[in-house]
Design a protein with these regions (language model features):
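Conserved, mostly hydrophobic/aromatic
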Residues: 50, 76, 172
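Active-site mouth loops of central-metabolism enzymes
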Residues: 69-70, 227, 231-232
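Short cysteine/histidine-rich metal-coordination sites, predominantly Zn2+-binding motifs
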Residues: 71-81
Length: 253
């Protein structure tokens, strides 16, 4: 019987793999044909929830989902192979509040869980090993996690650059450079952490790929109208962008 409950990882994978070869894919107008492939991008849900489930950003729904539920690399790779069988070429790894905390260590104990490079590498290389894969892009990154754990984050960044298609973006949710907004909304990334993370991504990701685009760049998110905001907030945001530009760092958007 149906009830209001959180799905398990096993249920999630069962339905996702069934959907990979369903009419939602095979009858999609953007799928195209074998001779003339269309632009369809198949988005995979990698995990749900956020590692900040105990005290996450006040405006966000993700912490309400509780402890993150991760799907295994093998389950996701199987789903994407089924999608390839149905004619899909392009894939985006979605549903991730932070690419760097996929199967991270210390999620229950730490404010900044430690990134685990092995599972995400297994997933990305497993997907890229299929010659049918065209474009591969990913989802968000938490700059504070990257800044607090530079060594494992650098290893993950190298893997992303090796396996993703050029033009890939890691969305960084700074939301605001204003300390008052930061405190009022329980944000966990400050401008110094942000710049540290941007430097790391630029170190490896600003090289250009075969299509002429930088391999991997940060995308910077701001939110207007948050608690604690003032006219000065916008000047702080602008000053931060000027600092990033003066340092010669690249952003995708």
């Amino acid at each position: 019987a149906w009830s209001h409950q959180r799905r398990t990882a096993e249920q999630w994978t069962e339905w996702a793999q069934a959907g990979a070869s369903s009419k939602a894919v095979t009858d999609h107008p953007d799928l195209g044909s074998e001779k003339r492939p269309g632009p369809l991008t198949y988005e995979v849900e990698v995990y749900q929830g956020c590692v900040r489930y105990k005290r996450g950003c006040k405006f966000c729904i993700e912490p309400k989902k509780g402890i993150p539920i991760w799907r295994t690399p093998e389950d996701i790779i199987k789903e994407v192979r089924l999608a390839h069988d149905a004619g899909v070429h392009h894939v985006r790894l979605g549903g991730m509040t932070d690419t760097y905390t996929y199967m991270a260590d210390g999620v229950r104990e730490l404010e900044y869980p430690v990134p685990n490079p092995e599972p995400i590498a297994r997933l990305l290389h497993g997907l890229r090993d299929d010659e049918r894969l065209g474009v591969l892009h990913t989802d968000n990154g938490n700059p504070s996690i990257i800044a607090e754990h530079l060594e494992p984050s650098e290893e993950i960044t190298k893997t992303l650059v090796e396996t993703l298609s050029d033009g890939a973006v890691l969305s960084f949710g700074l939301e605001s450079a204003d300390p008052s907004v930061h405190e009022a909304n329980w944000l966990n990334c400050d401008p110094d952490q942000l710049k540290s993370a941007i430097r790391l991504i630029n170190k490896h990701g600003r090289v250009r790929g075969e299509r002429g685009l930088p391999k991997l760049l940060p995308g910077l998110n701001f939110i207007a109208g948050l608690n604690g905001e003032s006219k000065e907030t916008y000047q702080m945001n602008l000053d931060l962008l000027h600092d990033i530009r003066r340092e010669g760092l690249l952003l995708r958007r």
